[in-house]
UniProtKB/Swiss-Prot annotation:
This is Uncharacterized protein YpfB. The gene is ypfB. It comes from Bacillus subtilis (strain 168). Pfam families: DUF5359.
Length: 58
């Protein structure tokens, strides 16, 4: 039983490290386009700044 408990503790420790690593990666915005497909689905990954036409002059 002690062997199983040690194995379970090791697995929990490894999973916690992986969880923290992934959360750390998602925390930074510059890495998100490479790991998240949502930006491609929304169509904002290759947006260009267009000239704006002002309709109201203040």
């Amino acid at each position: 039983m002690k062997t199983f408990e040690r194995l379970l503790i090791k697995l929990l420790f490894i999973q916690a490290i992986i969880l923290l690593g992934v959360q750390f990666l998602f925390h930074y915005q510059h890495i998100e386009p490479y790991v998240s497909k949502v930006i491609q689905y929304e169509g904002v990954d290759k947006m260009e700044e267009n000239n704006r036409i002002e309709t109201f002059k203040h």
